[in-house]
């Protein structure tokens, strides 16, 4: 019987390995940037076209490679970073597995140019799908240039799974920002489709953060520093009042490597307890230095998860350092805001203002005079004549009432009180329960409406109509409003600018890290502008639909969610009636934009069952 187990060809094995290393264009960007850093580069350029699907190029001024190394670097498990297994627990470089370049070369067209400083000529290599096409010498500057074209050209199924350019570009920017924040001593530039998105000169940590996330970020930062035997912490945390609903500006770096840790994030959130609004997320840029032998990086293909020897100690130190920084810079409250101070004041004095007492001095007073001598000073307390108690009963008939002579006709009273004619003439009235539900009587029973979901449905259909027909009304602002966003967010706003204008936004200018708004949709107040746009950008960053209609739909949903009346908001009776009427004027009144029930009906039969009638 013939054997059925066979060794896979190298190019097939490389494609399988590429599935773990290269998931999308951002994965290629991450690997190439880290290789440039390991090469000792002080200047790194990143160039992309069509969100990396067509072209990704990384150019550095590092030490370069020899002719032999240039060819060997594309072999699997070929690396200059480690020599033995023990080196995995004493890592000082970004890469160490030696499979990134082999994986990239297996699923793309790769062109590499490299030259060492002491060499006169460099090496030029072209590889297509793991196959060496050519290797030549060339006149090159010191450093290395990797050009990756047509990603997943030989795996159509993987290419079809890529998201829209906006989404893929967002992932690339995320990776670029993480690397740039971890290495503020390196000059980074990033170009996309010929436009410069980032130009980050060498600087300190604070300036690097400001250069990436706009100038307004500087006033939001609180420095943090702590040094212990097992952990050193440096960086910045955000002031609570600037916390957002999204988790965009949260970064942990361990030994200059970006990581994700829900455990350490919980320590930060614990330190902010009582300082944040519900659902708000603080920003933080924290650099943790630990001995390399106390962590294990080799547990995840992307190296974003790390195993610590003593997580509990790190948790306690990080939480304590964060609380200390918040208190040191007068961010943490010094009063207990949950205490009801009205309990300290007698009820009868709660609404009274303090009065300065009047002091009268007797100039003739002599303590050595005999007590029998009367002073000229006299004090007469002010008295008011109280009405005689009998006046309380003036006008009352003193004649006794004979209860026996009174008759009660309960049936007659009941029938007149609830007569059919009066019930029909009574106006329809709405009631608000717990500032959450609106109850409206109907012929068959009662209608119970969720006010937040109902308002979301109303606003959603209004915004969707305005976006579709491009006839939204705008309110012009007397003074333009400037809002600041990160580079990642600004790239997204540039892409959806036309759709935003169709909702009623009027942009006076779109700068590198800010926008100037001169007009708003009629349903958006000036104070709500930043909230609406932040929520919109946050929602679209999660997943930007490919089709234009789906993008409009997502925008309408996001704006409706931001502007809808919230649970816990008191509504006047007029507002309740308007909400009910507008809800049933919608095309899909039964559900919210997020497919949640907007109202339920409770019939008379249901009420009878409750009362066991």
Curated annotation (Swiss-Prot):
Please verify whether the record's keywords include DNA repair: yes
What InterPro entries does this protein map onto?
DNA_mismatch_repair_CS, DNA_mismatch_repair_MutL, DNA_mismatch_S5_2-like, HATPase_C_sf, MutL/Mlh/PMS, MutL/Mlh/Pms-like, MutL_C, MutL_C_dimsub
Quick one: a GO biological-process term for this protein? mismatch repair
Q: Which UniProt keywords apply?
A: DNA damage, DNA repair
Keyword Signal among UniProt keywords: no
Q: Name one GO molecular function term.
A: ATP hydrolysis activity
Q: Name a GO CC annotation attached to this entry.
A: mismatch repair complex
Task: Tell me where on the tree of life, at the top rank, the source sits.
Answer: Bacteria
CDD domains linked to this entry: HATPase_MutL-MLH-PMS-like, MutL_Trans
Q: Which family does it belong to?
A: Belongs to the DNA mismatch repair MutL/HexB family.
| Role according to the record | This protein is involved in the repair of mismatches in DNA. It is required for dam-dependent methyl-directed DNA mismatch repair. May act as a 'molecular matchmaker', a protein that promotes the formation of a stable complex between two or more DNA-binding proteins in an ATP-dependent manner without itself being part of a final effector complex.
Q: What is this protein called?
A: DNA mismatch repair protein MutL
The organism is: Flavobacterium psychrophilum (strain ATCC 49511 / DSM 21280 / CIP 103535 / JIP02/86)
> Gene encoding it?
mutL
